[in-house]
Amino acid sequence: MPSLPAPPAPLLLLGLLLLGSRPARGAGPEPPVLPIRSEKEPLPVRGAAGCTFGGKVYALDETWHPDLGEPFGVMRCVLCACEAPQWGRRTRGPGRVSCKNIKPECPTPACGQPRQLPGHCCQTCPQERSSSERQPSGLSFEYPRDPEHRSYSDRGEPGAEERARGDGHTDFVALLTGPRSQAVARARVSLLRSSLRFSISYRRLDRPTRIRFSDSNGSVLFEHPAAPTQDGLVCGVWRAVPRLSLRLLRAEQLHVALVTLTHPSGEVWGPLIRHRALAAETFSAILTLEGPPQQGVGGITLLTLSDTEDSLHFLLLFRGLLEPRSGGLTQVPLRLQILHQGQLLRELQANVSAQEPGFAEVLPNLTVQEMDWLVLGELQMALEWAGRPGLRISGHIAARKSCDVLQSVLCGADALIPVQTGAAGSASLTLLGNGSLIYQVQVVGTSSEVVAMTLETKPQRRDQRTVLCHMAGLQPGGHTAVGICPGLGARGAHMLLQNELFLNVGTKDFPDGELRGHVAALPYCGHSARHDTLPVPLAGALVLPPVKSQAAGHAWLSLDTHCHLHYEVLLAGLGGSEQGTVTAHLLGPPGTPGPRRLLKGFYGSEAQGVVKDLEPELLRHLAKGMASLMITTKGSPRGELRGQVHIANQCEVGGLRLEAAGAEGVRALGAPDTASAAPPVVPGLPALAPAKPGGPGRPRDPNTCFFEGQQRPHGARWAPNYDPLCSLCTCQRRTVICDPVVCPPPSCPHPVQAPDQCCPVCPEKQDVRDLPGLPRSRDPGEGCYFDGDRSWRAAGTRWHPVVPPFGLIKCAVCTCKGGTGEVHCEKVQCPRLACAQPVRVNPTDCCKQCPVGSGAHPQLGDPMQADGPRGCRFAGQWFPESQSWHPSVPPFGEMSCITCRCGAGVPHCERDDCSLPLSCGSGKESRCCSRCTAHRRPAPETRTDPELEKEAEGS
């Protein structure tokens, strides 16, 4: 049975509903039974408002189009919503996901030949624009277009930004000024599903302390601590944005403010507006006031180059330049100047009204010198009111700053002539303010020596390529090339920020290119691993034995202060939808037994997540640089891509760091030692020191468990000290649950009890390699690692699985297939019983049996007859089947006149009957019954478990 994880339940159900309306083409084989596995998706936090769907969390009243993965993709005609609980919209709690088909709600197009646009459900007429896309005449920003050329958003390969925009990605911008400050800031916000990712640049402002989002009335909706990553740049993410805030954002009523120490209520602020110019912006400028100080005056400019000529299109937004008393004029003349070192190069006149926040214009036919000054950041833009020459704002034009990361995965499938050698490449790039490009390229597994590394455009033909930079620095036998491309040019910088460039690696055997990758920007995710370390290259040549795969990938991995593993995996060249499910595993050195942790099973080429309960053995492998990240696919179930991971850490058992780690960087295979340098200390987080559990050394998680003198995070699993071999404990939200290991009967007459195992095993036949005096290397195919109880099993071993949080599953038996290393779990086949009242001999038995002496013999029959419960839970205690007891009700103690009994998993309680004469004279009159009578009283009062517990709470 395949060991691949199943898709999330909501996506699976939705896919079945969508496919169920299609006519069946024929009776096919029955679908295989899903393997027993532990729950991988995090449980919803108690009291949290929202919905969980497909591994993502959505706020109440939020709507989205479900993504079913390959080959279905995003279902644009299906709209899902997170509805509030039925018991009241004001009650906090998990919501309910409701999905419906919106295709019947599409309006009828008025034209004769409507078109179905990509990413839309309803058909629209050509040249039709919705009302939300119409802009005032003064703000109409025209994209550079030509009949023979595609627009920038459609040119080249689709990058990360375009893929994100196709999944609900929308850009907003805000000009931030203040009535009591000369500072000016610019905020760019991207809405990706239910998260806001923002990049904020500022001028003439002290270091901000917080980023504040509020409504038009000033009510604070969200605050984020400000930790500048570069000079004058702040990055952050607002996750799970509430529905009300999303409505304010789309209505352009959501405001952003920068809070400083001198202005705790906000020094500069402004509303977020949506504009289509953001999709093409590659250069920008922040305009501040010149001359005498005046507060609340400033502007920002969004610029882009034309696709067909050296013309600069721009949109300029300003505030405070026009006084309110000038509002009576219909048009106000403004003068725009382009300067270089104080020398006037160009001048434009623009007439705007006082009600419009800006205007759009074009600077045509830039000279070669002006293009060079543009990329160097030496062109200055100035704006002034012709009626008041003294009021003037200006700023230098430079390449757009962003918190996103420029990266590329190089693989053989994307080469000009596709090759399949198992090689891989990984690149990280940084564009400087002067137009220079810093590159760090890792290459592994090439068939021959690397002879050329180039940054180039998409070729029109195979022999017509425009090379922008010849990269150097890869020494013979080395894996990493680090250098600078000094002459990228304005056109090259523009194409780089538009995701239109490619990296090509040529070797002796493949001079035209053995590896090629698309350079794309990854949206900011909130973690610093991308900026602090190099990614880990993933190649088929690193798999043992090597796999000649045409795919490749790279991954960022890091450990935070809680020893939680953050990972992000990007792949390329997998071959599309026919590849099926892709899985990522973290494991130890190849050829040695040990844990194999499934990080994620996913569709497509990207995966990210957090692992909070990493095994101590894997943490030690990470610290020693012996851990591996393995990517498996349908075509290569034993591994298609692999990368070696090194994360220096001092994490201990249970997921807690007892001492501050000296370095947390990830060092990739073949990367220089500088990649493993310690990341910068984050302000506000004190250095960790040895401390008692719950002490001030680290913030305490309210869901952790304290057991045997140690703290365990939620979801952690471990062997307790009192029984390290035959017990397994789990932390489930401050509650420790320990289950004993129940051994199945061995399949041999003379089992052997190994000293390091709980259950007896059958002796294996002695192999030639096991003879004394011969070295033995353990083959990973000789055993299996079961993720349920995280233990290594010998080949041929059979056991009952432990699946947290459910505990021991005695109605299932798992078998280790030594040839493939797979774990096969199946249900126990219970025999069909001919007796009328079967019994369960032991409470932990799975199958029932006929009583001794009934004369009935078992028959082969229904599978999985073990539907009976293990016992009853009453007042926090477990009672086995058929057991009787007297309940205890605080503060009165044991209620001896009430008897409870566990039957069919439900406790039934009743008061003792005092009506029978037998009750009198037996001592019960003084203990239970108020009086004895020979007359029969009404039927005994029967109360269930909830009623008694309610009575106990009331008393």
Swiss-Prot record:
Record key words, sorted: Developmental protein, Glycoprotein, Repeat, Secreted, Signal
Main location (coarse class): secreted
Biased amino acid composition, Basic and acidic residues: 143-168, 938-955
Family annotation (Gene3D superfamilies): 6.20.200.20
Domain CHRD residue range list: 168-277, 279-402, 403-524, 530-650
Residues the record marks as carrying a glycan: 217, 351, 365, 434
UniProt note on tissues of expression: Expressed at the highest level in liver.
Domain VWFC: 49-126, 703-763, 784-850, 872-932
Pfam families the UniProt entry points to: CHRD, VWC
Subcellular localization, as worded in the UniProt entry: Secreted
PANTHER family (alphabetical): CHORDIN
Family: Belongs to the chordin family.
Official protein name in the record: Chordin
